[in-house]
Amino acid sequence: MTAPKSEFLAVVRDRGFIHQCTDLDGLDALLAKGPVSAYIGFDCTADSLHVGSLIQIMLLHWLQRTGHRPVVLMGGGTTRIGDPSFRDEARPLLTDEKIGQNMAGIRQVFSRFLSFGEGATDAVMVNNADWLDGLAYIPFLRDFGRHFSVNRMLTFDSVRLRLDREQPLSFLEFNYMILQAYDFLELGRRTGVRLQMGGSDQWGNIVNGVELGRRVDGLELFGLTSPLITTASGAKMGKTAQGAVWLNEARLPAYDYWQFWRNTEDADVGRFLRLFTDLPLDEVARLEALGGAEINEAKKILAERATTMAHGPEAALTAAETARKVFEQGGTGDALPTHDVAAEALAAGLPLAEMMRATGLAASGKEVKRLVSEGGARINDVAVSDAARLLGPADVQDGAIKLSAGKKRHALIRVLPG
């Protein structure tokens, strides 16, 4: 497209957020006229979102920053079914109680990125259970089922992948596409939403919603998707060998979150600064051009800005100071992940492998053995030569034992008084 007239599309284009759009010129014209309401849906399959959802959160962040209204759709209803998009198997079904708990945890994430309220551009959060729970099956099929072509739905990549692999796709999951399309229609009626955004895996679902709104209510709706984000080495964004990189501190300490960004591959620094921080693009260009050891300063800025957005400036500052103590001074810092043990248990001897797993430094005893054999397992900065080693009172320094896995991952065993 030519240079966008709307600030939102100009920002997200320049920062690398756009993958596909149903009508880019039409959307640009609409956004240029004044505030537009747009939404992204999030299913409640866990009590936190992880970094894999961050590009969608940042889209909503920039939408609000450029004068529009973000609508966060919580999938309290559709989570009971599960989105089959590009999954090898069905998701386990969750109870209503668990879905409610997960929604409460996810709500905490958005308060860092969006401003909620009653104003024209203040963010709102809605739950699709509010309208899906009351649907009557026969009237719903009569009024809306006729607008969906099964032939076409079978051509969507998300469905074809499962069928080509001869993996079962239940009727329950197949209905997810219809319900997501209905969400778009219902939000258009209730909140005036005109745009749905999402990841590239949601393209088929979004297009269904755009067409349903046009056929049923004559609405002019739009869809915009972001690209799948992978690292320079090809790894999927949001996952590490140690598990998901969660956005809630109850799931992942702010220090670990800071460290995740600090460990970004050199080739990804500029792209991640554009996508996951609000740094001006001229500053991003300057940092991206740094070479050699100087790129580490850019990584620290990436870690600081990303952690500030997710956890606040105080948590980011504490994490940076902890990292400085750990890596520059050899200290322990105050924000490292901790695991508490009783003094009596320590006196009896605690297996190193068990403590490495408890602190998240290793996923299994096999991984502990590998770390020991490679010289990567350390107690108080001293390499361990025996994977069967027991921790005892003699290892305690200043009330804690520092464990390390490699040069960049550390945790504390904190001893509770007897």
UniProtKB/Swiss-Prot annotation:
EC class of the enzyme, as a word: ligase
Subcellular location: Cytoplasm
Residue ranges of every copy of the S4 RNA-binding domain listed in the record: 350-416
One Pfam family cited in the UniProt record for this chain: tRNA-synt_1b
Protein keywords: Aminoacyl-tRNA synthetase, ATP-binding, Cytoplasm, Ligase, Nucleotide-binding, Protein biosynthesis, RNA-binding
Motif, 'HIGH' region: chain positions: 44-53
Molecular-function GO terms, alphabetical: ATP binding; RNA binding; tyrosine-tRNA ligase activity
Residues the entry annotates as binding ATP: K239
Catalytic function, reaction form: tRNA(Tyr) + L-tyrosine + ATP = L-tyrosyl-tRNA(Tyr) + AMP + diphosphate + H(+)
Chief localization: cytoplasm
Motif 'KMSKS' region per UniProt: ranges: 236-240
E.C. numbers: 6.1.1.1
Gene3D superfamilies per the UniProt record, alphabetical: HUPs, RNA-binding S4 domain, Tyrosyl-Transfer RNA Synthetase
SUPFAM superfamilies noted in UniProt: Alpha-L RNA-binding motif, Nucleotidylyl transferase
GO biological process, alphabetically ordered: tyrosyl-tRNA aminoacylation
The organism's place on the tree of life at top rank: Bacteria
Binding site for L-tyrosine: Y39, Y176, Q180
CDD domains linked to this entry: TyrRS_core
Disulfide bonds listed in the record: none
Gene Ontology, cellular component aspect: cytosol
Role: Catalyzes the attachment of tyrosine to tRNA(Tyr) in a two-step reaction: tyrosine is first activated by ATP to form Tyr-AMP and then transferred to the acceptor end of tRNA(Tyr).
Family assignment from sequence similarity: Belongs to the class-I aminoacyl-tRNA synthetase family. TyrS type 1 subfamily.
Quaternary organization: Homodimer.
Protein's UniProt name: Tyrosine--tRNA ligase
Gene transcribed to yield this protein: tyrS
